[in-house]
């Protein structure tokens, strides 16, 4: 069975999670802090309920598969197929009413990411890829005040960017880059980029896959933050690794780029080489 064979099931997971999450968005939802005294790290009833719903559907449909989730941990991590879930990536944006959050659904086969989706139910967008191709499914723009009439699918491709001085750079927040040396490294790249933007969460990576952003730089990521995004970015022609060129699916310090030329320039600055 290939990753493509799971595509319809991933759509079901996205539909189920979206139905759970949307009633909570832009409501008076309570956010708990799970940081234990560190940087505010919210979790909500919507996060937990959506992951529960997805886990239930996976267990019913593929009982031998493993699951790694942000809210409820790991089951059968050594299974041939492992689902990697982040029900709301960007919970800070979610509780602030900003639509840059998304549901991340990743599938690993023998430890390698083979399919991923970022579903944004509020904007009704689904970015998905298998490492060879990546697409966006969204509702076609309506004319006037008429409601959108049908789904539209378009191929995602990263854009050419040969130099940092031409690049648009995204990070969720420099405040989340906790180590002084890492922050200094990030600022070296930001200092040479044409434009820097903050607050994108998972949406920044999909904007990169769609050709609107050239670089995304983050630290302290977990597998559930990045596994789903890897096949989307690679399928769109981009690169995503750790700062030292390693496997991004394990998390840590992450660099994503749409063009290898700007990737190499950014990575040299991140690791202290010019």
What does each model-found stretch correspond to?
Residues 48, 52, 71, 87-90, ...:
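Generic detector of well-ordered alpha-helical packing
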Residues 1-8, 141-151, 274:
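Short, low-complexity, intrinsically disordered N-terminal peptides in bacterial proteins
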Residues 1-88, 261, 268:
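N-terminal subdomain of lithium-sensitive/metallo-dependent phosphomonoesterases centered on the IMPase/IPPase/PAP
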Residues 77-139, 143-149:
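DPxDG-like acidic metal-binding loop motif
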Residues 157-274:
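An extended, acidic
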Residues 21, 47, 58, 91, ...:
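Residue-level signal for inorganic ion chemistry
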